[in-house]
Amino acid sequence: MSFSSEVKKELAGQIGNARHCQIAELAALLIFCCVVRATDGGDIHIDYESEHLDVTEKYVTLLKKLFHISPEIIVKPDLRRRKKEVYQVNITDRSLAITILQLVRFLSDSEDFAEDVPLAHQVILNRSCCRRAFLRGAFLAAGSVSDPDKSYHFEIVCTEENLADQLCELMVELGIDARRVQRQKYAITYVKGSEQIADLLGMMEARVMMLQYENSRIINEVRGNINRKVNCETANINKTANAAARQIEDIELIENTMGLSKLPNGLDEMARVRLQYPTATLSELGDLINPPVGKSGVNHRLRKIGEIAERIRTQGGSIRNG
């Protein structure tokens, strides 16, 4: 599996709890993966297609959470790529299609399509968390990121120039130095800087892959600048990054099953601080806890969190405290 596919796999498993963020992410998937068409009989259909099963399953999950429906995923051969498959989801009920399009502000209450439809309605992107959710959806639908061991490149492919321009503006608002370029018939919004790409992965909540990206980036810098120290530095970086990635995975498992609020007293704060500061050292994490604790205290709490996560894996679900 490519680095980009691994990022998408992690992001596909991230379902925000806030309804407004779910709407923003769905809006992006609709823009980049769907075709809205009116039939001769006056019906409105929403046709979704993607080559990624994980992304398609997330699209269905968002529809289920927002509209309480479970549409079928249709698997078909991709005629453009041999030995590949595409995944389709078709909404053919006119009333449901209108409800979906109105929720994401593609249709007005009078069921009219707006001319020169923007990237997404300003109401949907009003909150910074929703802008990040929208960016996550856009990347899942039409984005890619190169393996940091080969190059530093992040891009989202748009079929229209105005969409690429607006997406570029959105990323700039989030503090990312995004650029746009034309590639044949496609408009590409892209980012080159390694630190900026790492920030993007963090914004989209690909925390584990962000740590792997940072790990690779730091290793590459060490190799290029201080060759004689590579072996020692690599071992330390790998140890720290792998430990942090494992902790993030444990916390996300708990968050998606029993919920962080059900952790024993003191562990819930530790879990939230680790999620918020995935690259922080044990000492730095200890300073962020109220009241502050030492490295041994942080290590003890993270170990307890790991034990709870392991019990969840063993039992195959959420567990009760104690």
Regions found by a protein language model. Give the residues of each.
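Short acidic, hydrophobic short linear motifs in intrinsically disordered regions
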Residues: 40-47, 149-150, 281-283
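Short helix-coil junctions and helix-kink-helix linkers
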Residues: 48-50, 155-158, 288-293
